UniProtKB/Swiss-Prot annotation:
InterPro entries: Hist_DNA-bd, Histone-like_DNA-bd_CS, IHF-like_DNA-bd_dom_sf, IHF_alpha. One of its GO terms (molecular function) is structural constituent of chromatin. This protein is one of the two subunits of integration host factor, a specific DNA-binding protein that functions in genetic recombination as well as in transcriptional and translational control. GO terms for biological process: DNA recombination; positive regulation of metabolic process; regulation of DNA-templated transcription; regulation of translation. This is Integration host factor subunit alpha. Belongs to the bacterial histone-like protein family. The keyword DNA-binding applies.
Length: 97
C-alpha cells in the first residue's frame, strides 16, 4: 500500500490541525518542491533525501514491438537520492511478502 496525500493530510488532522490547514500544508509542501525543481533548483530535505535534476543525453533506442531503431531525445529528469538516515531506517525494515 502506498502513502497518499490524503493520508498525509489525515495524519496532520490527527495531530491537531483542522482540515483546511492540513490541506494547505500538504499542498504547499509539494507545490514548493515542484516550483523549485521547475526553476532548476535541487531540493535537499535534511534527514530524508535530495531531489536532483539530471540531464540525460540523447541516445539510440529501439521500438520493442518492431525492433526498429529510434532515437531517444535528450531530456531532464528528476531523481531522488535518499539520505543516510532514511537509508539506514529502510534497511532495518523487513520485506513484506
Amino acid at each position: 500500500m502506498a502513502l497518499t496525500k490524503i493520508e498525509l493530510k489525515n495524519s496532520l488532522i490527527e495531530q491537531g490541525l483542522n482540515k483546511l490547514e492540513a490541506k494547505k500544508v500538504v499542498e504547499g509542501f509539494f507545490e514548493q518542491i515542484r516550483v523549485s525543481l521547475e526553476n532548476g533548483e535541487d531540493v535537499k530535505l535534511s534527514g530524508f533525501g535530495n531531489f536532483e535534476l539530471r540531464d540525460k543525453s540523447s541516445r539510440p533506442g529501439r521500438n520493442p514491438k518492431t525492433g526498429e531503431a529510434i532515437p531517444v531525445s535528450a531530456r531532464r529528469v528528476v531523481v531522488f537520492r535518499p539520505g543516510q538516515k532514511l537509508r539506514s531506517r529502510v534497511e532495518k525494515t523487513k520485506p513484506k511478502n
